[in-house]
Amino acid sequence: MTSKEFGKILQDKLTSEYGVELNVASNQQIYRSLALICRQMMSENHKKFQSKAIGTGTKQVYYLCMEFLMGRSLKMSLFNLGLDEVAKKALADADINLDSIFEEEPDAGLGNGGLGRLAACYLDGMATTDICGTGYSILYEYGIFKQKIVDGWQQERADNWLPGGQVWLKSHPDQAVEIRFDGEIHENWDNGFHYIQHTNYNSVMAIPSDMYVQGYDGKGVAKLRLWQAKAPDFDMSSFSLGNYNTAMSKNANAELISKVLYPNDNHVEGKILRLRQQYFLSAASIGDIVQNHLSSYATLENLPDKVAIQLNDTHPTLAIPEMMRILLDECGFDWDKAFSICQKVFSYTNHTVMAEALEKWNVDIFKMTLPRIYQIVVEMDRRAREELAKAFPGDQGKIDYMALIGDNQVRMANICAYTANSINGVSKLHSEIIKESVFHDYYLFKPNAFKNVTNGIAYRRWLLASNPGLCKLLDETIGDGYKHDASDLTKLNKYADDKTVLKKLNEIKLTNKKDFASYLAKSTGQVIDPNSIFDCQVKRMHEYKRQHLNALNIAAQYLYLKENPNADFIPKTYIFGAKAAPGYYMAKQMIRMICKLGDLINNDPAVRDKLRVVYLEEYCVSLSEHLMPAAEVSEQISLAGTEASGTGNLKFMLNGAITLGTLDGANVEIADAAGKENELIFGMLTPEVNNLKRVGYHPNAFIMGDDVANSALNFLERGWNGENFHEVTENLRSSDPYMVMADFKDYRRAQADLQKLYADRETWARMSLKNIANSGIFSADRAVLDYARDIWYASPVPMGK
């Protein structure tokens, strides 16, 4: 397609939608028109793709996740459709900058952190590799929240993303699914058949809206189906009798389910709402999957041959008993046959090594909210206990630990582990840890079910669409094969000693840093020096991710520079970006500490030219697309054995940042791929952490003999300008659950090594090159094909050339 032809399509859309000419259209009108053009093209491509899949009997993959962190869609849709250059030219001919149009789109408010971003990357990977994939989630009206930092404190504001994001969604009210909550269950037997009657229930309708993800330069398209909660009908009788509040409350209560991602569950009402959300997602999705399958095959007997359902974390666990409910109550299968089908179609990805993070629901809340599902889980638990008793005779403690219900709680992870045909971790280390600790007993019970698929990222978004300068260098050195196959990046290794290439790499990074500094100044007013080291830690704010370890070192560096103003110190800009869960008080204290430390340092003329701290408010996908190409140091500093994998670390690596991190999660594989000498590794190893926990960890043992640690803690404890951070420091001095103080000294050593290495620009560029060259293994394409081969047993749709 030529730019002229594209310009005509755009003008036709502007005329039909808004009745305006391109030269007078607003940026918002142009954005919406471009989105509609892309949506229509992707919808047509998806119909062809699905038709081919059904016609050839290709296995369908369904990916259930509570969140999909999609970011913006316009830029990547144009890019993957191969229309980015013609769109840019068509708009330039009308004196319009395409980048300014991209800024009109809000980030889709459907996710929070790595879990949701991984799900979004895998939709991209499925589309690109021609795996017939559908994602399922909830159409959150307000998403997670918009973060506002006021006087150092995080404030949560409604993220009203739908007015700008709705254009990507196509609603299908005719495909709504009824979801039933509460009520009573009545069981009857008639001529050997078991009948279930559910009475006095509350209905909620799940209305689907679809958005599409186009595969890169191909014919594959993935669909993301999002469910919106609506009351089944308006209570006109109550309204007519003057009971306005009753009539309206039914609507409001139903629609609460799809208002906000992860409502605060520090109270009973929040817990019930979360449970209702999870069942709503699970039941709507399973109902849709069953209906789709029946429309193609008219039987569920062959469901395992034609369908694979991936549960991404424990949030969609209730899909398992819901599938059982449909097979038993609506389709007349006996228990053994129904459970056999479930065992074959469901697989589960675990995302945490911390047992306390595995979801459990109070039995009374569960039974009241989901009475029929509770009955099914009780029967699953009874049968599981019988089976486990045969596997582990006499070991009642093990059976109780592995049971689906115990200690008055319904255990989501155990439902998954008992039922799923595959249980996978998301990095090699994580997959070993879950076999050794969290799911050790289940590993003994069904060892062949445990697998590993290391996380992958949609690398084209983070490289091809975000870092054109680096792509130009890659095209000139290794050709453009890497755009289709990320493993081609390894060809860059042969340039590791090419001084010209290394010099160009440094120049590209400096240009990207200048671009980011300019973007930051324009969007926030914050001024940073592009010639300083850009040291970045952007991820959820959480104690286990140890942003307070980073902050403690910044405090120590500040004190050092105050005492040694003429010290040889390469200027450094520390960049943070993170949201804290609304009910997570300590994480909010950590944000306040970092922000206040930044205010102090950035306003101190004695140090601000050598040290700066930037907190990126409302960190999101589109902001990260600006940051990743500019980053030089990737802080991945979780306590060894606590991070499952990570995805930010992979994006940083792809763009040439050096990992400053522990050997945790995917950092282990990053160091293996690029060479440990090309990262800055510090801290205890997982066995050392476990041993220290076993003998008893006392943070003061590490603080007492360390003057730097003592000074930094005292400084933060005393505070300044009437502010102090004793709650954070007291936590570090007393319990320190993530062993910040045990790793602090070695972390400082790694930071000192960083300064020395960075001073040798050629050495630093070589380290950067080795990271770029060996990052291809972490592509979502590779990860999806691993899942397809080892877990889903799914083949690509044979689309032909």
Question: Each predicted region: which residue ranges?
Answer:
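A conserved ligand/cofactor-binding region detector
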Residues: 1-801
